[in-house]
């Protein structure tokens, strides 16, 4: 069966997450106040932050009612995983109904990506995947940075930067908007996966080793604000389709902290505090929410054992009932959340 909000909360809790940001892509698209209000009735100690749709249906043709969505509980406004027309963005920014609420836009031009599956490189050609040119990120990024110059008071966030060129452009930008990076892009690249790995099927497209190194460096230097999970769970009916036609995305909240710890702490020499800044405090900043704090008698804590070994498989306890598009199946993982105060 497919994922629902309750199974999502359960998975996030057992993986140590106390907050979830949910994008407006749903059925129906979350561009009406009713869809915000109905989700706000869910009782959970995991804090749910709902993004409202920037445009109706995520189609980028007509603005949604920004004021109504934000007044009724939307944490901010986001569109689909590609850039809407600049004119509709200008229209929304000029109206300024979002005030200080965050706006999340993906610097991705799907017309330039076409059917590209992996960022254009030698490894992409060797794997036999259709290439995704770097211009599919760079050209919309140029547009968004130019727009941000004219509307610097807008709390703009760039959804999931994925290329070395993108990091370089942000580093050199006079005015820097906040930006996220997908966790999977920090732990894998298109030189490290087998041709049959489900981890190829992500948006934005997986890049090269140089892209991955630049993303890690960009995070460390605070060019990038936060790490996103961007979980997109699917069941067997979708997961078993050929990679070039299946729905893009992977799931696996339980993998995020162990694999990031391995890559950023063990291999890249980060301090634990830096990792926490990028997976907790940075996301709070982007969402315009208060940072998590450890307090006496609080249940908002987790215990993580970086040496705990376990086997990643779809039979893994607490993670077997829904999504089947988890990567790295049947492999040993080092590091595990062994307890969380939010687990009932």
State where each predicted segment sits.
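Metal-associated gating/positioning segment near the N- to mid-region
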Residues: 1-42
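Histidine/acidic residue-rich metal-binding segments in metalloenzymes
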Residues: 61-227
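His/Asp/Glu-enriched, well-ordered alpha-helical/loop segment
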Residues: 126-153, 220, 226, 232-304
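C-terminal cap of metal-dependent C-N hydrolases
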Residues: 242-245, 298-344
């Amino acid at each position: 069966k497919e994922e629902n909000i309750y199974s999502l909360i359960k998975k996030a809790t057992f993986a140590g997450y106390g907050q979830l940001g949910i994008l407006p892509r749903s059925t129906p698209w979350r561009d009406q106040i009713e869809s915000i209000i109905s989700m706000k009735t869910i009782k959970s100690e995991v804090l749910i932050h709902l993004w409202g749709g920037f445009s109706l249906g995520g189609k980028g043709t007509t603005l949604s009612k920004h004021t109504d969505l934000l007044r009724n509980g939307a944490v901010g406004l986001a569109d689909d995983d590609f850039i809407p027309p600049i004119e509709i963005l200008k229209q929304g920014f000029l109206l300024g109904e979002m005030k200080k609420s965050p706006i999340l836009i993906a610097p991705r031009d799907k017309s330039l990506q076409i059917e590209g599956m992996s960022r254009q490189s030698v490894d992409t050609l060797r794997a036999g995947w259709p290439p995704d040119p770097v211009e599919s990120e760079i050209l919309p990024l140029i547009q968004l940075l130019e727009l941000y110059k004219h509307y610097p008071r807008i709390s703009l966030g760039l959804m999931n930067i994925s290329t070395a060129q993108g990091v370089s452009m942000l580093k050199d930008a006079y005015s820097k908007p906040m930006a996220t990076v997908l966790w999977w892009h920090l732990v894998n690249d298109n030189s490290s996966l087998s041709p049959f790995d489900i981890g190829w099927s992500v948006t934005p497209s997986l890049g090269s080793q140089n892209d991955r190194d630049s993303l890690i460096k960009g995070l460390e230097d605070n060019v990038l604000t936060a790490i996103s999970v961007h979980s997109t769970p699917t069941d067997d009916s979708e997961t078993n389709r050929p990679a070039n036609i299946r729905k893009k995305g992977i799931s696996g909240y339980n993998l995020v902290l162990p694999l990031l710890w391995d890559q950023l702490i063990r291999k890249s020499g980060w301090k634990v505090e830096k990792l926490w800044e990028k997976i907790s405090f940075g996301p709070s900043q982007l969402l315009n929410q208060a940072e998590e704090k450890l307090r006496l008698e609080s249940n908002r804590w987790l215990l993580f054992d970086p040496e705990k070994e376990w086997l990643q498989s779809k039979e893994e306890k607490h993670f077997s009932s829904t999504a089947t598009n988890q990567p790295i199946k049947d492999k040993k993982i080092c590091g595990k959340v062994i307890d969380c105060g939010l687990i009932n």
